[in-house]
A protein has these predicted regions:
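Canonical Radical SAM [4Fe-4S] cluster-binding loop centered on the CxxxCxxC motif
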Residues: 95-132
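Conserved AdoMet/S-adenosylmethionine-binding subsite of the radical SAM
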Residues: 141-150, 155-317
């Protein structure tokens, strides 16, 4: 089945030709889908009825909103969406002074197996289509009636494990004729799929790459992240240097602090030594407690001390502001609770 919302402009023009229509109709349809964010062909005011009838063979991907939780602390909203095949995914709206940011999922489930992450419990179900990634943003923008200015691909899934669909999503999201979010306002995370980082670098996109590092050496990283058994910290950092050389974009390293595991002064100093000379920034995250995992988050003081020790060694660090902590804010938790509830009611 042709997924019309995942098609770029040239592909839409080809489709118009195939069904006996003028190519200019592609621009109109593209605008309705990606700028006006309509959910049906009937809403496309300047499209003739005869073309609308033809287009009914190509269903528009529209996510079904199952649940929305709103934080009483900071207004963060967590959305649970159902896909057309019944799978569920999560997205998060975060409100900042500079605008509205949405964190989206790139897969239903995840196969990376990071020990502290809820979204990988149960493994990978499937990759999301570009249209399913886009529609998370479109549904939320429509829901709040305000423009989404920033997008973070840091929800459930490993984005670079869904590489081709991710690239298509990025181009539709950032190019003219649609919602047109600047590449500089886009962040894509990865747990460290080294070959894909090189490929992404060669695309020379102007987005931010956020690398989940979480440890200063291979031994500790293997305790937390199975991917570390495949690619060493040295290999990962070399790929990051290549990414910066190709794009000029500073790397962000995500570092989740786990009490007694990776939060000591020595860990900070070792991390700083590894990152020396690399144009980067470290985002420190007290690990989110997950019911099925035994990890304990570092104390506030331990997090502050880690930041101070990094900066003493010349590495910039910030402590991530916690958003939506009262609404199952960590990746995968809302989806998992909903699935458990559904199972218990059967």
């Amino acid at each position: 089945m042709t997924d019309i919302k995942s098609m770029n402009m040239e592909e839409l023009k080809e489709l118009m030709t195939q069904i006996g229509e003028k190519p200019f109709r592609a621009k109109q349809i593209y605008g309705w889908l990606h700028e006006h964010l309509v959910t049906s062909y009937d809403e496309m005011a300047n499209i003739p009825k005869s073309l609308k009838e033809k287009l009914k063979e190509y269903p528009i991907t529209v996510l079904e909103e199952l649940d929305v939780q709103t934080s009483k602390v900071d207004g963060t909203r967590k959305y649970l969406f159902r896909l057309s095949d019944g799978n569920m995914i999560e997205s998060v709206l975060m409100r900042y002074k500079y605008g509205n940011s949405v964190c989206i999922s790139s897969q239903a489930g995840c196969r990376m197996g990071c020990r502290f992450c809820a979204s990988t419990i149960g493994g990978l179900t499937r990759n999301l289509l570009p249209s399913e990634m886009l529609d998370q943003i479109y549904r939320i923008q429509t829901s709040i009636g305000e423009r989404i200015s920033n997008v973070v691909v840091m929800g459930t899934g490993e984005p670079l494990d869904n590489y081709d669909n991710l690239l298509r999503f990025i181009h539709i999201l950032t190019e003219d004729g649609g919602i047109h979010i600047s590449q500089r306002n886009l962040t894509v995370s990865t747990c460290g799929l080294v070959p894909r980082i090189y490929e992404l670098a060669d695309e020379k996109l102007q987005m931010t790459l956020a690398v989940s590092l979480h440890a200063p050496n291979d031994e500790k990283r293997r305790e937390l992240m199975p991917i570390a058994n495949k690619y060493s910290v040295d290999e990962l950092l070399e790929a990051c240097r290549y990414y910066f050389a190709k794009t000029g974009r500073r790397i962000t390293f995500e570092y989740s602090l786990v009490a007694g595991v990776n939060d000591s002064k020595e860990n900070a100093q070792e991390l700083a030594g590894r990152l020396k000379g690399l144009n980067c920034h470290v985002n420190l995250i007290p690990v989110n407690p997950v019911r099925e995992r035994s990890f304990v988050r570092s104390t506030r003081q331990a997090v502050e001390n880690f930041k101070i020790n990094l900066e003493k060694c010349g590495i910039n660090g910030t402590i991530r502001r916690e958003m939506g902590s009262d609404i199952d804010g960590a990746c995968g938790q809302l989806r998992k609770r909903y699935m458990e509830k559904t199972e218990s009611e059967k």
